Structures are given as structure tokens and as C-alpha cells.
């Protein structure tokens, strides 16, 4: 298994990516940083180059090009996994490993190990214990509720890449949905959780038809939460 944490070339991203790496190292996982794609890299061109698809649905997001860049970062690793011979654990920089990692996990093709990071999917512990069995479960929600900790096999990555070639492309977590893929699973209790104080992708809407994306996040303090431009204060940025 190869492990990557998607990291923007920005001091705050490096800081929390290091936290992610350290949390994983405590349980014997070696995680490498993967340089995130940002809007300045023309993410839509990267998506089209990999998939051949030009149909994308990002424009309702507060920052469409940031969401496209997030998808392009994930997609690049999916593409790399599809050509490899072992599973990839793909982490986002604000993921933290807080529960035991299932080193001997047996799963189908693609599974989330991350606690839902948005929406109303976190019930009481008593309800969750009735809803889930310990270990691998069929995905209980319509899509991955955050792509902060996804484990996939090359064969799963291949199917995802192939479908991305002819389906409408949307934000990375909602793209990994049961409508498209019947093999999606989730591990319970979720080993990874998002610990975030800022976002380089999401924000509140400023225009008609745009989505408010901060208010549906879990475990954040909206009074102190920051929205940061991923192309601001980047090292060696021309």
C-alpha cells in the first residue's frame, strides 16, 4: 500500500499535512506528500487530459476553480493508482488518524476510512452502533461524505477513471457515489477524522445560484474559520 497526503504549497497546508503524516507514523504508516493542483495549474485542462471529458459541474460552488483543482488532485492519484500494482491510501491535508488503522483490511475496490466531514450524517454513538457493524460496511450514504481518507485498489481506480470519461464530473466526494459505483464501502469506526480551522476550497456563496458550503461542515468554529486562497503566499510563486 502506498500512502499520500494531498498538500498545497502553502505554509498552513504543510503544517497540517505534517500533522497528518505524524498521526499515521505512530501506527506504522509511511505517508508521502503529494503536491496539490491549484487553480493556477489549469485544473480543468488536467481533468480533460486524463479523462478526455470536458463536461464539468463546478460552477455552482463558491470557488469553482478551487473545487476543480481538488478534483484534479484526487484524479491524478486515481490515475496513478490505476497503473500501479498496489492499493493507494489518499489523504487530504486536514485528515488525522485517531483510531486504530485496519492494517489487515479486506475490501472490494474502493473504501472510505474517513468520518463524515459535512452534512447531518453523524448520529449518536448508540444509533451508529446499530447502523454499522465493526469493520467493512457497504456505503451507507449516497456518496463519500468527504474524500479525506480514501483507500482504493488499482482495479477500482480504473473503473472510476473510465466512468469519468463519459459522466458529468462534479466535486470529488459526490462523484464517488453509489449511483455510479456499486462497490463503494466504508470502514467503521472511521479511523480518520477531519480537524480543520481553514479551507482552501470551500466558502460561503456570494452570487445567485451558488452553494453555501461552510455551514454544512462538521466540527468547525465559523467564528474563527478561515477561507484561504490556495495560490496565495505559495513558496517560489512567480
Outline where the language-model segments fall.
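An acidic/histidine-cluster motif and surrounding catalytic segment
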Residues: 1-91, 95-238
